[in-house]
């Protein structure tokens, strides 16, 4: 079940909110846990058991970790390693088994001997909830949080349906207090509804519309590759993935507020970044901070000299690529960013920060490289990715433009213009300025949100099913 579906919007969501609010406070976590299991099991009930196994392992090992972390650190570390290995092992098995089998089978002695496991599919959201579970075990070992004694409350944390499928990755210590006591108010609920609606509109009205344009441009480029088509493909996908993923995050944060939770932000206008380093402070913030805290810093971070720092960065970005998927294009995507970030760390960042002109160049640098990176990210066949990237610079094309792509550009220019503006903070700033200067215009916000909701619902009902991109990770 996904947020942008009729069964969720008109069935599961209102029913869940009704059940949640009629329940006494003391059993609301139980209600959330059971509702989240129903939400998760709607699409693939067999994998509910996989998630419950991971929850049970982390919950049970949490007791000895918390008990021995001070009196017997070695024993606590044993239980930590057991928890991490079992949970990470589940992720590795389901996500990467067939990838490694298929690649090992390319070696002549193993060709025909190794066969992919039939019927092995990836449990939805396993990459996200595994990282959440690991954050609990690691933080508990470090003494950053306390042992959760309630299986129901811990299960509710892991399975919480607003962020179960595609994040944000919520660290346990960021919500441990909220699991016990959280505030509910009309203002908080209405804020959640507004945030959910904004995300829903971003996903349906902009993200899905851009996805359709991108798919069409891909077919055009395969037949008649031109430089303009390549650039339009990069632009539409760059905007599409932002509105799709940030839209989901907005919806998750909004849903969380409706039931009293406050999740950390996952995006901060990433396409305004002044460098690739800055971009990764703004894009998928929960994933970047997770790798920084649980991989990069434990490896030594930037404390052991530049060569070791580059090694640590390489490990992080190799894992980041693999986390996104069991395919070589994701590995290359991670390596691509490692190389760029290493160059920035070595000397480019200082140059970008020299003056206004170099900062502007840094912004252009970031936008072009991010767009190129998205082509690697989207194409599992690397030759197709390289063809589009080469086409951006006139390599392998039949010219700069064609009548077909010229017509498509004129047809989609309003969508592209609205999308570019919506990817910046300007709409929010203009609205805030209007509300502060003319208080009567405060009514404009709910009206616009209501219109956006109706338009998005109409588009969703009349359109085809389009799951979130990060749904598959």
Spell out what each predicted region is:
Residues 1-472:
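Membrane-embedded transmembrane alpha-helical bundles that form the catalytic cores
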